């Protein structure tokens, strides 16, 4: 895994839009990872079911998002391996991310949100209960040695902002301060990511090169999200790496986040679809022709992305349900013509119905590649100063027919 080298600039802009409300830009992290980008969210401590070699075929620079909750059950093994490695010459690490840039997140992206008991975060995995405090968090960072790590906080959802009591706000801030002071003592060069939140007071806490906007993706409309982010980011100097974690992270949510200036958008959507037996399949506009205003495009995204039954759903054609029986005989059509995975829809349908592991592997690789391709087009359009038009054309060419 890549650690931050003090001789390099952690994040630098390559080109940007000068609009105050729409500060979208292209950049590079640690001289290798081009932004805007989306990491592969690991369901387990490793990016199961794919290997690093597989991910390297999808992403030019592997970028992994690892969850605290997936590391906690492995903590005794990690500690034992670390102890033995000091006394024995071992050929490789127990968890070897092989050149990937890694980001350790507190959010549970595939499960229900965590709770607090006696100042411990509580996770439930495989019917087992795990507790996380600031000292355990520090231990995990020292063992995993990620490139970046979020500071765990009780993430208050902006969709429930009117329900925040003074007691809850104070608890949120105290929890953050406690974790921050402990994690500063980590022995490695992991970059801590500062959360920007109305409940957090940043007093004498130094400069951060990476920031996140927590609490989004839980029912607020995209227009509400825009207004809140604009308010929360009003005092930023603009040089920080900007990160947002989304609970769903659909294509339209991705485009919305990039327009608002986020460099890293964490989305479990490709992996969630893979578990559901669904394949991403959308058109990428080949020609960019129009001069839409950003405000118009934001309203269009708000109209076409709705919060339904606890998740965000795009009102466009972007998903193929390969469990559906209509694909049993579709041996000619790939999941998407643009994909690196050339298996037919009928073949994947067969694998899914037989509960073959290869079905999940093929779908995971396909969906991650589709998102990587979307982000590459986003980066190209920013460089060509056509991002707003690209977003508008993307929505138009994927609209569902009435």
UniProtKB/Swiss-Prot annotation:
<dbReference type="GO" id="GO:0101030">
    <property type="term" value="P:tRNA-guanine transglycosylation"/>
</dbReference>
<dbReference type="GO" id="GO:0016757">
    <property type="term" value="F:glycosyltransferase activity"/>
</dbReference>
<keyword id="KW-0808">Transferase</keyword>
<dbReference type="Pfam" id="PF01702">
    <property type="entry name" value="TGT"/>
</dbReference>
<keyword id="KW-0328">Glycosyltransferase</keyword>
<dbReference type="InterPro" id="IPR036511">
    <property type="entry name" value="TGT-like_sf"/>
</dbReference>
<dbReference type="InterPro" id="IPR050852">
    <property type="entry name" value="Queuine_tRNA-ribosyltrfase"/>
</dbReference>
<comment type="similarity">
    <text>Belongs to the queuine tRNA-ribosyltransferase family.</text>
</comment>
<dbReference type="InterPro" id="IPR002616">
    <property type="entry name" value="tRNA_ribo_trans-like"/>
</dbReference>
<protein>
    <recommendedName>
        <fullName>Queuine tRNA-ribosyltransferase-like protein</fullName>
    </recommendedName>
</protein>
């Amino acid at each position: 895994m890549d650690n931050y080298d003090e001789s390099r600039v952690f994040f630098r802009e390559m080109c940007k839009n000068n609009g105050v409300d729409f500060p979208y830009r292209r950049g590079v992290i640690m001289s290798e990872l081009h932004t805007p980008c989306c990491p592969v969210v690991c369901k387990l401590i490793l990016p199961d079911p794919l290997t690093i070699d597989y991910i390297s075929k999808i992403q030019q620079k592997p970028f992994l998002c690892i969850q605290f909750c997936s590391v906690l059950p492995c903590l005794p093994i990690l500690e034992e391996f670390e102890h033995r490695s000091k006394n024995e010459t071992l050929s490789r690490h127990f968890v070897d991310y092989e050149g990937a840039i890694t980001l350790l997140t507190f959010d549970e992206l595939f499960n229900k949100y965590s709770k607090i008991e006696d100042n411990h975060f509580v996770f439930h995995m495989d019917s087992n209960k795990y507790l996380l405090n600031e000292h355990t968090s520090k231990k995990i960072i020292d063992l995993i040695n990620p490139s970046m790590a979020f500071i765990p906080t009780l993430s208050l959802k902006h969709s429930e902002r009117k329900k925040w009591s003074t007691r809850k706000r104070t608890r949120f801030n105290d929890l953050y301060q406690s974790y921050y002071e402990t994690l500063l003592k980590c022995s490695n060069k992991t970059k801590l990511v500062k959360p920007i939140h109305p409940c957090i007071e940043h007093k004498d806490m130094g400069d951060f090169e990476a920031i996140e906007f927590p609490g989004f993706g839980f029912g607020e409309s995209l227009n509400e999200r825009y207004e809140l982010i604009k308010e929360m980011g009003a005092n930023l100097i603009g040089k920080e790496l900007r990160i947002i974690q989304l609970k769903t992270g659909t294509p339209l949510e991705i485009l919305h986040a990039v327009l608002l200036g986020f460099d890293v958008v964490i989305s479990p959507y490709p992996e969630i679809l893979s578990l559901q037996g669904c394949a991403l399949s959308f058109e990428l506009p080949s020609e960019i022709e129009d001069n839409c205003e950003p405000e118009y495009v934001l309203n269009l995204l708000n109209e076409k992305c709705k919060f339904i039954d606890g998740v965000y759903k795009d009102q466009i054609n972007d998903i193929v349900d390969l469990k559906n029986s209509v694909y049993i005989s579709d041996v000619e059509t790939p999941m998407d013509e643009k994909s690196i995975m050339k298996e037919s829809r009928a073949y994947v349908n067969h694998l899914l119905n037989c509960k073959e592991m290869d079905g999940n592997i093929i779908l995971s690789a396909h969906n991650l590649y589709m998102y990587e391709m979307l982000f590459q087009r986003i980066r190209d359009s920013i460089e060509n100063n056509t991002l707003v038009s690209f977003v508008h054309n993307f929505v138009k060419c994927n609209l569902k027919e009435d």
